[in-house]
Amino acid sequence: SLEEPDKKILKEKTNLDRFVKIVGVDQKSNGFEAEINLSKKELLKEEKISNKAGPTYTLAEIFKAIELTMGDENYQKALEKRGIKDLSLIQIDPWPGGGFVKKNIKNGNRALKAISFLKDSEKDNAYARPIQGLIAHIDLTENKVVEVEDHGVVEVPKAHARYDKDGQESLRENPKEIAITQPEGVGFSVEDNLISWEGWQLRASIDPIEGLALHQVSLNNRPIFYRAGLSDMVVPYGSSDPMHWWKAVHDGTE
């Protein structure tokens, strides 16, 4: 992500070097932070991250967790116990452990939990049909499923939740046309990341942790905010069900 310059430096100078910060993980699950000067093409520093913390999970790790779970013998036996044999209809969703990691996973190892859903066809909405009571625990560092947690067979819902045309018994009549016109053009302007509207000016950027960030927000040239971002928004599931009690989704920053 872009390493934003200090507020004081940005106000004093216009021609600044551009810096980026990389938070990554290597193939041995070691986290690291690196800072790079893009203007001079220099690596300024690289530091190891404590094993008490870690970078965001990568897509490669997500796909690896799905592959390991799908190929695990105990997981397949748990599906068979539920009468499920066609693995092509299984959707696996890996989740962060929410700070609750199995004791047989070494401290500092990258770990995920996987929950599953059963589709009745390739285009089905799998989230309407959860496979309850089944959780796979994956050690990404060791490349294996360490445990399949099975809380007993619960019948998979039969109803689907598809909203496509083919998934409906009948369709409603077409709504009446809505026409929104601006004969004199729009009332705002966008130039690169600078947005201007009715005396307001702001710059917008996307931060990999915070999401949308607003910079140098002003009204009629009067400063309002130097920077505004959403630091966090956690959605705890608050359920005692073994499938959900450990979930605390960072919807605003994850």
Where are these regions (language model features)?
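Post-signal-peptide, soluble extracytosolic/periplasmic N-terminal scaffold domains
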Residues: 1-85
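Beta-strand/loop-rich accessory regions of lumenal/periplasmic or secreted enzymes
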Residues: 52-56, 60-254
